[in-house]
């Protein structure tokens, strides 16, 4: 896989072009690509469910952030926050459009819970506990997160909050669905407490 296959990385690159001259942006991007490949080489043979997160989201963020931070520490966080925010807000807009279709709000939480169990379960490096799982309320706590794990492993725990914020952008403004969260692992909490109410 190459860095530009990640939608997050492409968004980071667009943010870089806004901040840096073209030649410097290109140079940073090339260095980030090399850093990304190194991360892949250091973490071979990951299960597909884990790789879906590391290759698309986690490793691109680490590679871009550390590359920029080495020369421009004040701009590195800005690139990640703005770039990830753009992608996550688009995801939120897609969910919002979906929920406007007749009947979708009635089944959304049940379908969403299946997606959580499959894409954010033990096979993907997460641990979670479901508290409530009905058609009107979905509540679960994440107690282990690969985003936190890999950011800590590569000495950049300060970027974990960006992934947490992505959830707020994606789920925080949905019609008919209220998203509540009071803490995250990435911001010092005991868990990531997700609660959706219809």
PLM features: residue spans?
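Charge-dense, low-complexity intrinsically disordered segments
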Residues: 3, 51, 74, 154, ...
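N-terminal, charged low-complexity regulatory/assembly segments
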Residues: 1-68
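Amphipathic interaction/junction segments at domain boundaries or subunit interfaces
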Residues: 56, 60-62, 66-154
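Generic structural motif
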Residues: 28, 126-130, 179
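Hydrophobic, Leu/Ile/Phe/Ala-enriched alpha-helical segments that form helix-helix packing faces
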Residues: 16, 68, 120, 167-170, ...
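C-terminal non-catalytic interaction appendages of large macromolecular assemblies
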Residues: 136-198
